[in-house]
């Protein structure tokens, strides 16, 4: 099997990108594949004795079978839990898609199965002229969309799908991640998305009482990605 790499985006902040990404990495590991998860830029990092650390990036590192240091997983760590471009301005740092792509490129072909997780949604700014979509374009990665299932998600999902396709990247799969267990007509919403999104649904992750990569992996189908 050739090495596979994908860009993980979501309909919004807290859509469940990291839960799904770590679930997919766990599923790949169970198939005997080497894995690597990357989070090129992360805001909302905590100061530790080792430096700034982000919980999402640490989760991706934990599901990576390759022995990578934290800085390889998350090369740009920002402290404030706000939009990355604003956090960078506050820290007097600059973000660019080209620089972030450079961090990723050296790692993309190291593992059998690599995921690059964005921050927030598809159009999150990096600077006045670039967004995270530009990073995905530079890396030329097929995209997996995580849809946070709550009221309003159909519009968010379809607009994101449209943006991904307009940016010239293939959408190779999507995941319904249930954020609101009491969401009215949940199944009908998922069916509406499946009818309208031109990519396979990789699974429906329910609201988990104990959210973990292994628990999420039980609800995900890796086959469409390995066949992509």
UniProtKB/Swiss-Prot annotation:
Keywords: ATP-binding, Biotin biosynthesis, Cytoplasm, Ligase, Magnesium, Metal-binding, Nucleotide-binding. ATP binds at residues 14-19, 56, 117-120, 206-208. Pathway: Cofactor biosynthesis; biotin biosynthesis; biotin from 7,8-diaminononanoate: step 1/2. Its EC number is 6.3.3.3. InterPro entries: DTB_synth_BioD (IPR004472), P-loop_NTPase (IPR027417). GO terms for cellular component: cytosol. One of its GO terms (biological process) is biotin biosynthetic process. The active site is at residue 39. It comes from the Bacteria. Its cofactor is Mg(2+). It is an enzyme of class 6 (ligase). It is found in: Cytoplasm. GO terms for molecular function: ATP binding; dethiobiotin synthase activity; magnesium ion binding. Mg(2+) binds at residues 18, 56, 117. It catalyses: (7R,8S)-7,8-diammoniononanoate + CO2 + ATP = (4R,5S)-dethiobiotin + ADP + phosphate + 3 H(+). Signal peptide: none annotated. The keyword Isomerase does not apply. Catalyzes a mechanistically unusual reaction, the ATP-dependent insertion of CO2 between the N7 and N8 nitrogen atoms of 7,8-diaminopelargonic acid (DAPA, also called 7,8-diammoniononanoate) to form a ureido ring. Belongs to the dethiobiotin synthetase family. Homodimer. HAMAP family: BioD (MF_00336). This is ATP-dependent dethiobiotin synthetase BioD.
């Amino acid at each position: 099997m050739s090495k596979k790499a994908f860009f993980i985006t979501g309909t919004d902040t807290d859509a469940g990108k990291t839960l799904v990404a770590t679930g997919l990495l766990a599923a790949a590991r169970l198939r005997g594949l080497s894995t690597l998860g990357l989070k090129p830029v992360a805001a909302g990092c905590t100061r530790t004795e080792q430096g700034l650390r982000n919980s999402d990036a640490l989760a991706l590192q934990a599901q990576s079978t390759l022995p990578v240091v934290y800085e390889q997983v998350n090369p740009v760590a920002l402290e404030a839990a706000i939009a990355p471009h604003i956090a960078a301005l506050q820290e007097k740092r600059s973000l660019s898609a080209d620089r972030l792509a450079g961090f990723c490129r050296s790692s993309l072909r190291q593992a059998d199965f690599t995921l690059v997780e964005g921050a927030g949604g598809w159009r999150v700014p990096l600077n006045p002229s670039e967004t995270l979509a530009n990073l995905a374009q530079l890396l030329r990665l097929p995209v997996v969309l995580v849809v946070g299932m709550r009221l309003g998600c159909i519009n968010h999902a379809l607009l994101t799908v449209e943006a991904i396709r307009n940016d010239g990247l293939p959408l190779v799969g999507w995941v319904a991640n249930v954020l609101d267990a009491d969401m009215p007509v949940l199944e009908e919403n998922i069916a509406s998305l499946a009818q309208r999104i031109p990519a396979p649904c990789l699974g429906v992750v329910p609201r988990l009482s104990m959210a973990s990569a292994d628990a999420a992996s039980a609800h995900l189908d890796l086959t469409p990605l390995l066949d992509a």
